[in-house]
């Protein structure tokens, strides 16, 4: 619809999903990397993201405690878990992935438990209904079931119905936490998070000819954006800082504000 509305020359192409189902929670046996290193041949060995997250949180197959939650000590994945993960993730990505696991620098949805509880306790049906993706029916259900809501994931299970899907409720709860009431009609800026050195000339040309401001330093944003753009950027920075704060609480490392983070240059 967006392409038609913009009269775009882009031709969309659908790609058939390979491997396990979208919400499959088990990791398949076998080596996906060796079976299909370029992801082009048909195989049943591709795990879903849900299954990979489940393996990280429950390395014993659902019988052990979730590793490295916000209130639990950081615990590295065992060798068996690491080997299974390495068979499901491309080598270069697995290196970064395992580094984060070993240092405990990752969050699960239940890292938001305390924040979610606080946010829901101060709301009523009318105020909840003002958040993006929160219908009046969902707002009433949240208030009626509030005494039963414990963790983030458990809250989703309690609140979901045939009409209110798991994904919809997850989005709604995140919007409540992040204080998001409406979606912007358009994004009035582009923010660069990183680039390759050899692409610096291209970046310069984009900056010169783009119809919207290209942000490389947050300190410059206020003068480049209008009030709507600054508001959207402020919400983005808040979300990033919240994630960073939760990581710091979990790992004990020093907090780094989003405005202090350097561009990634490869």
Residue map of PLM features:
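Active-site cores that bind ATP or allylic diphosphates and position pyrophosphate for catalysis
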Residues: 1-266
